[in-house]
Amino acid sequence: PSMEGVARSMTDRLLDAFAGSAARRYGGEPVTELAHSLQCAELARDAGADDELQLACLLHDVGRFAVDPRLIFDKKDRAVGAGPDAKGHHDVGADLIAPYVPERVAWLVRMHADAKRYLCAIEPAYWGTLTPGSRYTLTLQGGVMTPETVSSLTRHPCLADAVRPRRWDD
């Protein structure tokens, strides 16, 4: 297939996924998955974020609803039945969009869970701001980052860009 055909197919797949997410609740939260994604992107826009950061905010949870649930291990209702090759929704989403978006956007989507782990490590009070569902998925995503991992991550030039969407997401 042509690149245009592949792009059209991917766009259709994402639009179908977003349409399906319009009716599904976001975990145990009082909002749908679609509303959650749109809200995060809108907060990014209102904060003056650049286009790539806004796109990453829109797509940060695409791995939750655009693929077979057995591929994902970090949702409370899917954790038990996840297959042996299951990944977190952040990795699934980043892998899904990587061929179609700038590298930074895919990296920001991939860092979505690690940004939560990082913030819990450097700001102990941040954990208290998380919903019960987000606290639960934190344990599935590796828990609070170790000091060694924090030290390694702080050297990344896009760390601040990964943390901003995390705060808008909560």
Q: What role is predicted for each listed range?
A:
Residues 1-2, 150:
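N-terminal amphipathic/basic-hydrophobic helices that include classical n-h-c signal peptides
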Residues 3-18:
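Acidic, glycine/proline-rich low-complexity segments that act as flexible tails and inter-domain linkers
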Residues 5, 28-31, 84:
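Short N-terminal micro-motifs specific to bacterial/archaeal maturation
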Residues 8, 34, 159:
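Electropositive phosphate-/nucleotide-binding environments in soluble metabolic enzymes
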Residues 15-39, 72-79:
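Active-site flanking loop/helix segments enriched in acidic
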Residues 43-167:
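Divalent metal-dependent catalytic cores for phosphoryl transfer on phosphate-bearing substrates
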Residues 170:
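Charged phosphate-binding loop/patch that engages nucleotide di/tri-phosphates or the phosphate backbone
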